[in-house]
């Protein structure tokens, strides 16, 4: 998901997506520890996507004050 797509989401949608992505990230980490993934860089990509979403949420929070 690109930053432009993240910015188009409403705050409520963004919060829901962050929760879903964190759950998916945790599940990938658990699965990877049990049996190695074919593409372990997916974990890194997921972590960075979560960071982008949280950064956008924080920017919105600061702009509203």
Swiss-Prot record:
Pfam families referenced in this protein's UniProt entry, alphabetically: Ribosomal_L29
Record flagged with keyword Transmembrane helix: no
Protein's GO biological process: translation
Domain of life where this protein originates: Bacteria
A GO molecular-function annotation: structural constituent of ribosome
Record keyword Ribosomal protein present: yes
InterPro entries: Ribosomal_uL29, Ribosomal_uL29_sf
GO CC field: ribonucleoprotein complex; ribosome
SUPFAM superfamilies: Ribosomal protein L29 (L29p)
Keywords noted in UniProt: Ribonucleoprotein, Ribosomal protein
Family: Belongs to the universal ribosomal protein uL29 family.
The protein's name in its UniProt record: Large ribosomal subunit protein uL29
Organism: Parabacteroides distasonis (strain ATCC 8503 / DSM 20701 / CIP 104284 / JCM 5825 / NCTC 11152)
